[in-house]
UniProtKB/Swiss-Prot annotation:
Propeptide residues per the UniProt entry: 204-206
InterPro entries in alphabetical order: P-loop_NTPase, Rab, Small_GTP-bd, Small_GTPase
Activity control summary: Rab activation is generally mediated by a guanine exchange factor (GEF), while inactivation through hydrolysis of bound GTP is catalyzed by a GTPase activating protein (GAP).
Entry protein name: Ras-related protein Rab-1B
Keywords from the UniProt entry: Autophagy, Cytoplasm, GTP-binding, Lipoprotein, Membrane, Methylation, Nucleotide-binding, Prenylation
Protein purpose: The small GTPases Rab are key regulators of intracellular membrane trafficking, from the formation of transport vesicles to their fusion with membranes. Rabs cycle between an inactive GDP-bound form and an active GTP-bound form that is able to recruit to membranes different set of downstream effectors directly responsible for vesicle formation, movement, tethering and fusion. Rab1B regulates vesicular transport between the endoplasmic reticulum and successive Golgi compartments.
Organism: Dictyostelium discoideum
Gene Ontology cellular component terms for the protein in this record: endomembrane system; lipid droplet; phagophore assembly site membrane
Domain of life: Eukaryota
Taxonomic lineage of the native organism: Eukaryota, Amoebozoa, Evosea, Eumycetozoa, Dictyostelia
Sites bearing Cysteine methyl ester, chain numbering: 203
Pfam families: Ras (PF00071)
Length: 206
């Protein structure tokens, strides 16, 4: 075990281009925000270490490009992810409608029992909001995942979103299975690299 941390969790941010994935990452990792929009090319990542229930957890958070032309590149990053945050823009109904497609991507590429979270970003834009909170919550409930509305600009619920993910993953790491049929098979990560890309959809980590 690495003396600097007890767990290393790999998280993935996915969703349409322009929904604010990079801004969420910057807010959580660096506590910064910029109005400038620069589309992510391929993938980017940041690391933040947190203390949760007396355990030091290193979060490696990958920000993926939302554009279709990068799907082949980014799909490989689903494998080995412990948690995936699906982000939509509360002022853009198309981005919410596309959440179902992103969920299908998770089913196709991620391990079967990966932790998921639905996030409606830009909740500070109250006058421009067109995706009802109740509609998004109903969808999240229908697929059995948590839901939060966030604002990378005001930092509302950003910390909570990532802490929810870390907490849920840690439960699985500690052997607490929310679903008895779960095939999640993760252990404390050794600092020797990432999970190799393979055909099996099992969250084993080496």
């Amino acid at each position: 075990m690495n003396p600097e941390y007890d767990y290393l969790f790999k998280l993935l941010l996915i969703g349409d281009s322009g929904v604010g994935k990079s801004c969420l990452l910057l807010r959580f990792a660096d506590d910064t925000y910029t109005e400038s929009y620069i589309s992510t090319i391929g993938v980017d990542f940041k690391i933040r270490t947190i203390n949760l229930d007396g355990k030091i957890i290193k979060l490696q958070i990958w920000d993926t490009a939302g554009q279709e032309r990068f799907r082949t590149i980014t799909s490989s990053y689903y494998r080995g992810a412990h948690g995936i945050i699906v982000v939509y823009d509360v002022t853009d109904h198309v981005s919410f409608n596309n959440v179902k497609q992103w969920m299908q991507e998770i089913q196709r590429y991620a391990c079967d029992s990966v932790t998921r979270l639905l996030v409606g970003n830009k909740c500070d834009l109250i006058e421009k909001k067109i995706v009802d909170t109740s509609t998004a919550r109903e969808y999240a409930d229908s697929v059995g995942i948590p839901f939060l509305e966030t604002s990378a600009k005001s930092s509302a619920n950003v910390e909570q979103a990532f802490m929810i993910m870390a907490s849920e993953i840690k439960k699985l790491q500690g052997g607490i299975q929310p679903n008895n049929n779960s095939t999640y098979n993760a252990h404390v990560v050794k600092p020797t690299g990432f999970t190799p890309i393979g055909k099996k959809k099992k969250c084993s980590i080496i």
